[in-house]
Amino acid sequence: MWRKTPGEDLGGILHFYHEIRHEFVRNEDSRKGGIAVKDLYLAGGPYYGVQEVFSRIKGVVETTAGFANSSVPNPRKEDVENGKVQAVECVKVTYNPKKIDIGTLLSVFFTIVNPYTDGIQGKCTGPHYRTGIYYVSGEDTPQITYYMAYYQNRGNSRPVSESCLVFNEYENEKNIRPPIRTEARRLENFYAAPEEEQYFLRKYPGTYSPIDIKLLEETGTLEILT
């Protein structure tokens, strides 16, 4: 069981960075196939693992792997990887809010990533692998703030990865709660990755991913999460 430190204040966990650059971002509320949908942008290591998970979530209409918050238009993947453009590998999650809410999406996100490391997910390291939640609608900030505070309060967690199925239920011996390294900020821009990069794990199932997709399949974890 998770224990709250006496007197611990959930407030002040999340510092939002409010930018004004929106020229590359369309309005979050849109329609796809006649259905009103919303978008949320999630980063958690290599985008192909995150995309594979969220593409299987009921209520998610579409996922697109790409790069978020680049300092230059249409960044090349090699420039993202070497840190030249300050972008992060990210997945655009388009969902039907009548079938799934942002809270469920964030619960899935915090289950499959390690939010306590900075630019490290499994064996993958680099600033482009940092974890992040990027929003385009201010109405999402209360939910994001709540979940950030909640997982900060829960302590040091392990992700579903490295063939180790642990649902963010771990505290170290000293009960130390490291700060969450996940950034939560307004989306500045998003550029889709090349087509060959979309649904990469389905094309190349042997590719290493910090998120153990096979274990998720074998245990039916996605059904549990949704």
Locate the predicted segments by residue.
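Flexible coil/turn and secondary-structure edge motifs
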Residues: 2-226
